[in-house]
């Protein structure tokens, strides 16, 4: 005759077999990470197989190492997910960052470290003294929360240059040497200039409103303007832009020392640091000039904050409503990326 277990026995069995919510979440997270890692490995192997097939078919193409594929995919996923988790990127920004990060990493590790330096420092500075910035900026977002448009305007030019670099030179690191590889060296400096320009502008925008003791001056007329005015510059902002670009150039230079083998028979690489600083400063100046002339700035008399959209309640300060902030960033990045490497090629030291 079968006996029915008592309620106490059933409860004990249930408590032994049933996991609490926190344990379940840990197991689910662990399984999810395993699945994601497995997918990443499969994707990396698939890319490697395609590169090997293309190399065999065309003959002139150099196959990419499977470890390079794996590193490029893993790092891009980790950084994008981390940026989204910390609110530096929104959903679309994380997807855009994934594409930009992957292309720059697979092309050249020096590109990757420069991008990483720009992203990490800019994200930290955006969050720095956020409460104070919220009182000064009408469009302030916690953590930055950059979308795909902002990612494209800051990373679109470097991404296109990285693709052209791979077509010209193939994936891999190389010394900057205009005498031996003029076109590829120009592309590398152009990409560095674009990233350093964006970093310089971001550093100036995030540091100057907090640390500057004096009112900004409009770059076109040198008149004093309220904090947050497009085209307003300060000494603190200009120094910050120089430092921002220098940090990006330093990241590129250090990566060259680690991954490039024939530096002893190539042109000196130390000018990369000065080049990055100059690109950051020039990018900030060009951005300020475009902002002062082609971007509307007005004072909202109801809030006392500077706004970028003309309304009946705003008092015009400077500029015309032709471009928005994203377009200004894109145009300044393009101009610096085109002009500065051409000028640098004439002064770059030789062996």
From Swiss-Prot:
It is found in: Membrane. One of its GO terms (cellular component) is membrane. InterPro entries: DUF92_TMEM19. It holds the Pfam family DUF92. Its main location: membrane. It comes from the Eukaryota. Keywords: Membrane, Transmembrane, Transmembrane helix. The chain crosses the membrane at residues 30-50, 64-84, 99-119, 233-253, 272-292, 328-348. It is a multi-pass membrane protein. Belongs to the TMEM19 family. This is Transmembrane protein 19. It comes from Rattus norvegicus.
């Amino acid at each position: 005759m079968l006996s029915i277990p008592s309620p106490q026995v059933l409860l004990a069995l249930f408590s032994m077999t049933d996991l609490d919510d926190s344990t379940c979440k840990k197991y689910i997270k662990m399984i999810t990470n395993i699945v994601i890692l497995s997918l990443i490995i499969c994707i990396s192997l698939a890319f490697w197989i395609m590169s090997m097939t293309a190399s065999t078919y065309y003959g002139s193409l150099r196959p990419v190492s499977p470890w390079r594929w794996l590193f490029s995919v893993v790092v891009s996923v980790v950084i994008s997910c981390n940026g989204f988790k910390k609110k530096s990127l929104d959903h679309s920004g994380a997807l855009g960052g994934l594409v930009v990060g992957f292309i720059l990493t697979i092309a050249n590790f020096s590109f990757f470290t420069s991008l990483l330096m720009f992203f990490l420092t800019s994200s930290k500075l955006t969050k720095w003294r956020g409460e104070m910035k919220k009182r000064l900026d009408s469009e302030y977002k916690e953590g930055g929360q950059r979308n795909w448009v902002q990612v494209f305007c800051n990373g679109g030019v470097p991404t296109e240059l990285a693709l052209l670099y791979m077509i010209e030179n193939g994936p891999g690191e190389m010394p900057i040497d205009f005498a031996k590889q003029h076109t590829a060296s120009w592309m590398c400096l152009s990409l560095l200039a674009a990233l350093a320009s964006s970093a310089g502008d971001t550093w100036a925008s995030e540091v100057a409103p907090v640390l500057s003791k004096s009112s900004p001056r409009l770059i076109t007329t040198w008149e004093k303007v309220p904090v947050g005015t497009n085209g307003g510059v300060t000494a603190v902002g200009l120094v910050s832009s120089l430092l921002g670009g220098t940090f990006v150039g330093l990241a590129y230079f250090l990566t060259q020392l680690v991954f490039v083998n024939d530096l002893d028979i190539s042109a000196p690489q130390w000018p990369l640091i000065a080049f990055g600083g100059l690109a950051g400063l020039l990018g900030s100046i060009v951005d300020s000039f475009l902002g002062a002339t082609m971007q509307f700035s007005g004072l909202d008399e109801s809030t006392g904050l500077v706004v970028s959209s003309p309304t009946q309640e705003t008092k015009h300060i400077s500029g015309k409503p032709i471009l928005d902030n994203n377009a200004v960033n894109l145009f300044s990045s393009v101009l610096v990326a085109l002009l500065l490497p051409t000028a640098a090629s004439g002064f770059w030291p030789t062996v």
